[in-house]
Amino acid sequence: MIKPIGMVHRDGNPFEGIPLDADDHACVDFRFCADPKMRWWFDHHPTAFQPPALREIFDRAHEPTWFFDPKAPSCAGFIARTLATGWNWQPPTHLIDAVTWADKIDAATFSTAQEAVALELPAQRIAAWLANGRSGMDTARYIEWLSHASLAEVAERPEVAPQIAAIEEERAKDLAAIEKLAVWHDDVVVFDRFDDVGARNPGFLGYWLFPHAFYAVAGTRTESSIKITVGFNKWTTSTRKPTVDVGALCARFGGGGHSMVGGITLRGDELQRARETIAQLVAELTKH
């Protein structure tokens, strides 16, 4: 039986308190874990090794089931290609489709911001659901569902379809709230949604609403956690070039990510720290 455990970036060791007591363990799309019980590890984030000393352990031990490729568009695609090469694994058709979409969504290789926020296709609808308001139990079920069903079939499940419908119905409300909350610092736009507990992260909607934005910083929270995201608007109308490694910048505050996008997770009671962190992020993004 597979038991998914959702990991959260935080100060210190995020694996502390996570029981590694199963017959086998795998960590995917998350920071490196040097515990010898973690037999499988796949990641594609340049900030995977925190603290940096963990990179030395990875290079020295380099277990044959530890895999790292910061150039991979998505971890899902990286895993599929690695297993195909090393173990001759052939994914079923429905997973090939899921991996193709994972590469596109994770790397944001959409031609326009409008395409990025569309909710027309099953993969786009599932992506919106995964990004907004699903519970840890939903995520665990999603992993199980996707092991034997297509994205279209998962999107129509009774546990998922009503939540996707709610996202669609509330899209106009979210757009109005995001537009009203936008605060500009040069060409960096900030969306502080901390006062609306449970509010959705703007994600690509911010880029769609404000095509002249160069970077976007957003803050959202639930009762238990706070999430800060930082991203470069690859569809920006601005002519300046990105000079900030966003993932490395977020890593300085306990988070991580890629060169163009990153995130930071704090406890739900760290609101003051969250707003101070956003101010520091903006200062870094506007001085370049």
Feature-to-residue mapping (PLM):
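Glycine-rich, Lys/Arg-enriched anion-binding loops that position phosphate/diphosphate groups
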Residues: A107-R200
